[in-house]
Amino acid sequence: MAGVKILENRIESNGTTIALNDAENCSIESNILVTKQDGVNYKDKNGLTLNECDNIKITDNYISGSARNGASVTDSSGNTLENNTIENVGMNGINIYNGSENNIASSNSVNSAKKHGIAVAANSSAVIKSNSISKAGDTGILIYNGSKGECSGNKVKNAVGHGIVFSKNASGKAASNTVSGAGKHGVLVTDHCGSVALSSNKISNSKQNGICVSNYSSSVSVNSNSISGSGKSGISVSSHSKASL
């Protein structure tokens, strides 16, 4: 399937509102996608799903109420998710997963996701820029499990867990992000990560450390960050990790 435009619809469903499989060069724009939480198909459904799709543009949509992820991108590459509003979802606001490469998530607003605001996982890659993420139930932005993420200009506020995390052999950079009110660390690099650069971030009022590098992570650079109001240390590097400050 190619060249399909899904534009200005209002969809209320007990299951996934829009699902594309094996599609390319399509657009999903200016839709209102609401998952109703009272049907037999509600459990384990995403708001919007891309599976084996390339070059899909997802813009200016409102997504609410899904049991799992607001927008799920699986085994799909070259897709753009921009200027969407995602709120009150059961897992991640945006989930980029399973070898999905060269995707972009920009200028989205993600509020009250029960797990992570934006997650990039399982050998995927994404540019994550200029998003506003608030009240994530765990982590604001998570890059993990062999994935690469370039995070810049994001605002992450009041995450219950960490603000931004690189974990499990992840790599990439976090630059010029604003992280405030994290319930744990503002920015965490952990679990054998390498080649991570943290620069020019503004991190305030983290309950634990502003920046934490731990658990055998190496080749981590920490430069020109502004850190205030941390409950523990501004910057913490464990004895089994290596970082240049």
Where are these regions (language model features)?
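Parallel beta-helix/beta-solenoid
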Residues: 1, 6, 18, 22-24, ...
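Low-complexity/repetitive intrinsically disordered segments
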Residues: 1-9, 226, 231-245
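Compositionally biased non-globular segments, especially hydrophobic aliphatic-rich helices
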Residues: 5, 14, 26, 38, ...
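Low-complexity, intrinsically disordered/propeptide-like segments
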Residues: 10, 23, 36, 51-53, ...
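Extracellular beta-strand/beta-solenoid scaffold signature
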Residues: 12-21, 39-51, 65-73, 88-97, ...
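Short regulatory "switch" loops immediately downstream of catalytic or recognition motifs
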Residues: 32-38
